[in-house]
A protein has these predicted regions:
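N-terminal membrane-targeting/pre-transmembrane regions
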Residues: 1-50, 142, 176
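A broad, low-specificity signal marking well-ordered, structured residues that form hydrophobic/aromatic
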Residues: 82, 119, 143
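Short secondary-structure boundary/capping segments
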Residues: 74, 81, 111-113, 134-137
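Conserved beta-hairpin
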Residues: 63-107
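Acidic, Ser/Thr-rich low-complexity segments on the non-lumenal side of membrane proteins
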Residues: 96-126
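Hydrophobic alpha-helical transmembrane segments
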Residues: 50-63
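A membrane-cytosol interface segment of integral membrane proteins
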Residues: 125-176
């Protein structure tokens, strides 16, 4: 038998098969990251070339530095790919975003608090707060997926997760 041991239980290789992926859109990636870098450098340039009062100069330098940090974080985050298998949603850096067994619902509605071109997953219990700009975020029991991602890929993944949740819940009803 082949497989992987995970949480002291046997996992079949078929459960690790990738069902859907989300890649960041290159055009959005260039535009978003490029805009942030231009903003960062512009703010720092203004602070150095035409120094206002010392307090404002420090504020502009800090703002420029934070913008550069966010730009770099976004560049690294959008370099990853999100993968969905039968057990979990994860990114290619190895971070498990959410396990299928912990998911309660998926919301893609127009009025959902979700990223652009994305969807919102509600979890049974809260998890560690984290943010990967342009790809996904997690606050408490909510996971937002999307941002610099193509709409068709996120729609397919959202529908796949919804089908998996529905199947799981129906199987639980059958067992009762």
């Amino acid at each position: 038998m082949t497989g992987y041991v995970r949480n002291m239980s046997f996992v079949k290789p078929s459960e690790l098969e990738v069902l859907a992926t989300i890649h960041s859109s290159m055009g959005r990636r260039i535009l978003g990251i490029g805009s942030l870098y231009v903003l960062s450098l512009s703010v720092i340039y203004v602070a150095i070339s035409q120094p206002p009062a010392l307090g404002w100069q420090l504020f502009l330098l800090v703002l420029g530095g934070v913008s550069i940090w966010i730009s770099e974080k976004m560049r690294r985050a959008t370099g990853n790919v999100l993968e969905l298998n039968h057990l979990e949603l994860r990114d290619t850096s190895g971070v498990v975003i959410a396990r299928i067994e912990d998911m309660v619902s998926v919301d893609r509605g127009a009025f959902a608090f979700k990223p652009s071109n994305g969807f919102l997953i509600r979890l049974r219990a809260g998890a560690e707060r984290t943010w990967q700009p342009g790809m996904w975020w997690r606050f408490g029991t909510c996971v937002g997926v999307g941002g610099m991602t193509p709409g068709p890929q996120t729609k397919f993944m959202a529908e796949t997760i919804l089908a998996m949740i529905t199947k799981r819940d129906l199987d639980l009803l059958k067992d009762d």
